[in-house]
Structures are given as C-alpha cells and as structure tokens.
C-alpha cells in the first residue's frame, strides 16, 4: 500500500498568509546565527557575556498558518480526522436557541456528577479542524510553506502525506509526541522545524526526505539521536539542543554536509572521533554537557569559526585545536582546565578569548601576543597570581580585559602602553595594594572596576582619565579621595562603598553627569555643600556612616529618586529643603534618631515624610 497518495495538485509559487490571502513567496527562512560569550553561563537561547545560543529559522511570513496562536492544553479528545465530539458542536452557532443541543458533558467513572466539557477541549477540537483545513488547502493549492506552529497539535494528521509540494514545514511549539509515518512522503521538504514538542523518536520513513537541509529538534525528549537522522546526508543544519541525549553514535560521520551542529544542553559525556569527519562544519555547539575530553579528531574540522565548549567538565584541550585557523570564537568558560595548549597560538583569527571559571594559573608564554586579532580577553575566576607574560604587545588591539576574582597583587608598569583602545578593565576581587605609577596614561578608559582589593590610596593622576564613566572602588582601604576627582567630568557612576573615607572633597560637586553616588559603610561625618550641584544624580547612598546632618543644598537634587541615609546614629533631623526633591521615590531612614519627625510619619514612606517637611517648613514658597 502506498502511503504517499496525492491529489495531484499543480505546484504553485504562491504561499498563503494566516488570513488566507495570496502573497508572493517570502525570502525563505532566516539565516541561522550562533553566538556565545562572557558573563553568564548559561542558559537560555543567548550567551553573552558569554552564554551560547542557536537560532533556528522559523517561518514568520508568506506561509499558510493552520492553527492560530495556540491556546488549549492537555490531550485532545478529537481524532485527527475531526470526528468524535465535533459533530455535536460545529454548527451550533447557526441554530436557534430552542433547537440547539445541550452542552456536551463528560461523566467520569469516579464521580456521578456530570462535568461540562472544558473550554480547552473545545479549543483543541477547533484547532484540529483548522489543521485539517490547512493541510487540505496545502494539498489543493500546491503550497510550499506551511506554518502550523503553536497550534496545540498532539497528533499530526496522516493527510500530511498529500502535501507533496511542501519545502518548508513549521511545527514548533506544539504537543506532538510522535510523527506519522506519512511524513516521509514529503520528498521535497528542505526545512523541518519540530522544536518545542514532546518527541522521543522519529519515524524511519523520514529517510525519504532526501532534500532536507535544516532539521530543528530543540526542546524535545530525545534520549538519543534518532538513527534515521544519520541517513539524511543532505542536512546542513541540525539543532538538537535541550534534549536528553547521552551519546553520539559513530554514524555521525555520515553527515558530511553539516555546517552547523548544536548539541547544547544535553547529557553527553563523550564526543567520538566521528566529529572529525564533519569537515564542513563552521559552527559546533556542545556547551552545557558533561564532556571531560575532546577527541584529537576535532582538529580535522578546519572550517570551524565558532566552537562552544563552555559549561562542560573538560580537563584538557587537545593540541590539534591549533589546526582550527579559521576559529573566531572559542568558548571555554566554566570547565576544569588547568592550562591551555600552546598550539592555540595558531588560531590567529580569534577576536575573543574567554576562559572564565577554570583553574588556570598561567597561559603559554606570549600566547595572547600571538593572537593579534583579540579585542576581548576574559581570564576571570581562575588562579592567576600575575598578568600573563607577553608584555604590552598582548593588549595592542584589546578594548576589554577582565581579570576578576584571581590572586593578582599588582598591575605591571607600562603593561597597557600599547593598548590605545582599552576602555574596560575589571580587576575586582584580587590582591592589589596600589595602582601603577602610569595609571594616568590610561586616557581612553571608560569603565574601571577595582572593587574588593586592598587599595589604600588613589593617585592624583586619576584626573587624566577624563573619559571615565564608571569608577568602582568599593571594598578597599581608602581613607580619602583626591581633589582631582573633580576632573572626571564624564563620570556617571562612582562607587566608594565599604572603605574608610571620612571626608569627601568639595570637588565632587563638579561631576555634573554623575547619576549614582554610593558612599555607604564609610566614616563620613558630613556631605560637602557642593553635592547640591549634582543635578543628574538619581541614586545617593550614604547609609552606615557617621552623618550629623544633611546639607540644605540636597534640596537642589531635582533628579534624585533613591536616598539611603539609614544607620547614621548621629543624624537627628532632616533639612526642610529635602521636600524640594519632588522625584524622590525611595527614602530609607531606618535606625536614624529623627526625633523631630513622628514615627508614624516615618513609617508612611517618602511622600509622607516630604509632605511633613513641607508643612513644617519655614519657607512658605515650598
């Protein structure tokens, strides 16, 4: 018996939108993209800072939309041909009330109480009818692109076999547990999107789809790669992210046309030598698995430009990695590496080097200097005790360096002398006691994070960093801030939390672009009156200090939204001028002995406190 019978509809270049009106063919599926980077591991469909993503080409126009936007849930009692409960309901809307049938009820065995059929079931019945109609139109009009995504489909009707002209079929975000054998009749299919379903296997008949190029199986329940996939030798893009796959068979070597393979977020412990046969791969994502080693054969994938290995359990990287001279991005974040191979020097196209979250103590001599295309270097959360060897040459084209959470006790003098484009430096959580004497030459620095070190002094030369917008010095041992801080006219964020500062310089008032000033947990007894010039300040935190009073000029902070002055045991009153801060949304005055303001007013929040200050102010114009 031939399962692939067809009505013989003439092929058409027309595709239908969700409204059923003819449209010209769209441009086809969007190109697959792949990125990963620093910051977070993890997870979700995008890496930044460093987590990886894969984006499948989903149809969004020029298609016949079958099931609308979904809705419904649970099992659909209607069969795939639209019968069962449908005959009781489908024409009720056109019947007069007196002749209209009663609502269908379902009596459960465990209960004698009749229960009305839920709206979900009715919606699912309608969804099934819509899908059947969409398949019929697809057959009759020779439609090539069909979008049945988000249609609450649990069973794909076997009439799909009649849609022989289909080249693109989108079934993502449904509830499909198994595909019908008839899917193999779609011999012209090139793109098949099955992501976000409940598939545990694929039918062997899929092998007849010999023109299939893009197969998306993300977010299903596959415990292994279905064997039929290895017979789809025309595949160029294969997404298997977020399944339950534990092994990769040697048959993978048959997919020689693959350019993109995503196995991200599975349970794979070993990647066999078969990976080396995929010489056309440009993107390989095996992040978020349980790999401890990579095969030497990975070096045969010489066309790789993106290799994402982050969030595994890698103990080493094979020397053959140096063969990947087209490599631009290499994700090694959060593994168990103690070192990286010298051969990485050969990967001269890499523009980002990120080994965050490993146990690396040093890099091969001069490795970073050899990677002259690097623009971003992230070595955070390792065991470095000093800067990598290689001198100033290793940072020539770099704009961002992150060495957070290591054991580095100094920044070498002149190390950034050739880093003319360096704008971001993160040295948080190290063991720095001082900054190098040439800190004043870092004139292009925009963001400088020196938090959680042991700095005792900020050099006067800080005044030369006039492009600085973010300066974070929290949790150090600073006793004072130099007057030259006033030269940093572009500063937007100044964080001095948890130091030993007693007095702020008057020049702080020159920072007219300042938006956040964080001074909590110091020994400050008073704020300079010049603070009133900070017209763009939205956040001011002076909690846990020794404030005796707030200057009247605080009333000039028209942009202020958040004010933290809690836990100042000597602060007994607030200036009436504070009532002029009309944009104040949050005011924390806990554990301040404000005897002049009644407790019930204090408990009422910022607006009530401001109202009280205004009412009791000697300035009637307020």
From Swiss-Prot:
Q: Where is the composition biased (Polar residues)?
A: 1-30, 85-94
Do you know which InterPro entries this protein is assigned to?
A: Leu-rich_rpt (IPR001611), Leu-rich_rpt_typical-subtyp (IPR003591), LRR_dom_sf (IPR032675), LRR_domain-containing (IPR050216), LRR_R13L4/SHOC2-like (IPR055414)
Query: Is Repeat among the key words of this record?
Result: yes
Sorted UniProt keywords: Leucine-rich repeat, Repeat
Q: Which GO terms describe its cellular component?
A: cytoplasm
Q: What does this protein do?
A: Acts as a Ras effector and participates in MAPK pathway activation. Probably acts as a regulatory subunit of protein phosphatase that specifically dephosphorylates Raf kinase and stimulate Raf activity at specialized signaling complexes upon Ras activation.
Q: What is this protein's record name?
A: Leucine-rich repeat protein soc-2 homolog
Q: Which organism is it from?
A: Drosophila grimshawi
